[in-house]
């Protein structure tokens, strides 16, 4: 497999592109991505066989199950980061080791039902929360100490909408086709 093929498997929707300014209509579209994501993911996996959850989306990549558990972990973190940023002045968030978490017993279990339920609940609450934001609320920022950058909630929203699409394609790529 050459580097271009590997890059396509790693980033099936392309790498994340930072957006400095986000319009109200773009923000509405990004929130719609978050709102629709749990149902889209459920539809992708509803016809998975047990073996499909054990497949990786690329060589040395996570299994479909690990990706789904990662999504639950990551999106819980993001939702809480939004809440901290809304209620605190430029909080420093707590990063976590995604790779290590994916190897824990709950992150590598092939039964993904609990993580799908987490995503459904978190995304419902997250979107309900975002729907009440003003334009200025999205300008609030948090600091990511591992990356050493400040994220506005606009940027974080764009990142997590991309994250949904990115990993949805990974999960699709794990399905065994006859």
Segments and roles (model prediction):
Residues 22-58:
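Short, contiguous, helix-prone interaction/anchoring segments in small proteins
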Residues 28-35, 65, 69, 113, ...:
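A generic "alpha-helical surface" signal
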Residues 32-39, 44, 102-139:
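Acidic/histidine-rich alpha-helical segments that form the ligand environment
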Residues 21-22, 33, 44, 85, ...:
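Residues that form generic nucleotide/phosphate-binding pockets
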Residues 1-13, 17-19, 53-99, 139-178:
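Short, contiguous alpha-helical
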Residues 26, 101-114, 146-155:
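Acidic/His metal-coordination segments adjacent to aromatic residues that form catalytic metal sites
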Residues 40, 44-47, 51, 81, ...:
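Amphipathic, soluble alpha-helical interaction motifs
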């Amino acid at each position: 497999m050459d580097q271009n093929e590997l890059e396509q498997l790693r980033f099936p929707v392309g790498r994340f592109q930072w957006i400095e300014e986000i319009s109200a209509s773009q923000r509405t579209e990004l929130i719609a991505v978050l709102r629709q994501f749990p149902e889209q993911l459920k539809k992708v996996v509803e016809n998975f066989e047990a073996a499909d959850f054990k497949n990786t989306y690329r060589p040395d990549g996570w299994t479909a199950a690990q990706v789904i558990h990662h999504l639950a972990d990551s999106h819980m973190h993001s939702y809480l980061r939004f809440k901290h940023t809304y209620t605190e002045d430029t909080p420093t968030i707590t990063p976590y080791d995604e790779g290590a978490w994916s190897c824990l017993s709950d992150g590598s279990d092939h039964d993904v039902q609990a993580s799908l339920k987490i995503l459904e609940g978190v995304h419902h609450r997250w979107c309900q929360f975002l729907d009440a934001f003003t334009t200025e609320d999205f300008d609030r920022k948090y600091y990511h100490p591992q990356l050493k950058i400040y994220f506005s909630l606009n940027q974080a929203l764009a990142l997590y909408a991309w994250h949904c699409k990115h990993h949805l394609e990974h999960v699709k790529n794990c399905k065994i086709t006859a």
